[in-house]
Amino acid sequence: MRHNHGYRKLGRTSSHRAALLKNLTIAIVKAGKIETTLPKAKELRGYVEKLITRARKGDFNAHKFVFAHLQDKEATNMLVTEIAPKYATRNGGYTRIIKTRVRKGDAAEMAYIELVAQ
């Protein structure tokens, strides 16, 4: 039974799921908007929003925290110095999920996940 289960498995091992979320986060930070399956987008939303909330402080510890999760210098600098300051007065809700289509090959629901413009 799935009662009170805290996250989506996404059909992957825990390390594969962590790598997937990390790579999707790097992609959304660099591009601002990506298309993925709806369950991945819903799982990614919480991951990205926690990073943005920590990055809003902008200090050394924020850089360390974000880099520990992303392992990408370029994405870390973009998130802490460019993206997070835009949301300084916003309490959460940094991302938006828009359902787009049903993928032809496997009938998976697709969605855009994007950073909300300020």
Swiss-Prot record:
PANTHER family: LARGE RIBOSOMAL SUBUNIT PROTEIN BL17M (PTHR14413:SF16), RIBOSOMAL PROTEIN L17 (PTHR14413). Part of the 50S ribosomal subunit. Contacts protein L32. One of its GO terms (cellular component) is cytosolic large ribosomal subunit. Belongs to the bacterial ribosomal protein bL17 family. GO terms for biological process: translation. Gene3D superfamilies: Ribosomal protein L17. SUPFAM superfamilies: Prokaryotic ribosomal protein L17 (SSF64263). It comes from the Bacteria. This is Large ribosomal subunit protein bL17. One of its GO terms (molecular function) is structural constituent of ribosome. Keywords: Ribonucleoprotein, Ribosomal protein. It comes from Campylobacter fetus subsp. fetus (strain 82-40). InterPro entries: Ribosomal_bL17 (IPR000456), Ribosomal_bL17_CS (IPR047859), Ribosomal_bL17_sf (IPR036373). The keyword Cell membrane does not apply. Pfam families: Ribosomal_L17 (PF01196).
